[in-house]
């Protein structure tokens, strides 16, 4: 059974809005912002794979693999930065890091 493209795009849209809400509502917590960004990127991957399945090409799968590689690098760098900031300021609240003092 093949899932219609409309259902895939609706699910991708719901996931994207959920990630956007997660990013906007919990703007103070850096980890929750990262989770929201990851949910939005996963929604984009789902839309690419669904569209590629609809038109019978492999471009969506290739692009989703590139997004996976990019997000793994992004998560590793961002979590290393969060650990460093937590050791430095003892918090992961984004509002505490708005000063540019040295």
From Swiss-Prot:
GO terms for cellular component: NADH dehydrogenase complex; plasma membrane. Keywords: Cell inner membrane, Cell membrane, Membrane, NAD, Quinone, Translocase, Transmembrane, Transmembrane helix, Transport, Ubiquinone. It comes from the Bacteria. One of its GO terms (molecular function) is quinone binding. The keyword Electron transport does not apply. Pfam families: Oxidored_q2. It catalyses: a quinone + NADH + 5 H(+)(in) = a quinol + NAD(+) + 4 H(+)(out). It is an enzyme of class 7 (translocase). InterPro entries: NADH_UbQ_OxRdtase_chain4L/K, NUOK/Mnh_C1-like. NDH-1 shuttles electrons from NADH, via FMN and iron-sulfur (Fe-S) centers, to quinones in the respiratory chain. The immediate electron acceptor for the enzyme in this species is believed to be ubiquinone. Couples the redox reaction to proton translocation (for every two electrons transferred, four hydrogen ions are translocated across the cytoplasmic membrane), and thus conserves the redox energy in a proton gradient. NDH-1 is composed of 14 different subunits. Subunits NuoA, H, J, K, L, M, N constitute the membrane sector of the complex. This is NADH-quinone oxidoreductase subunit K 2. It comes from Geotalea daltonii (strain DSM 22248 / JCM 15807 / FRC-32).
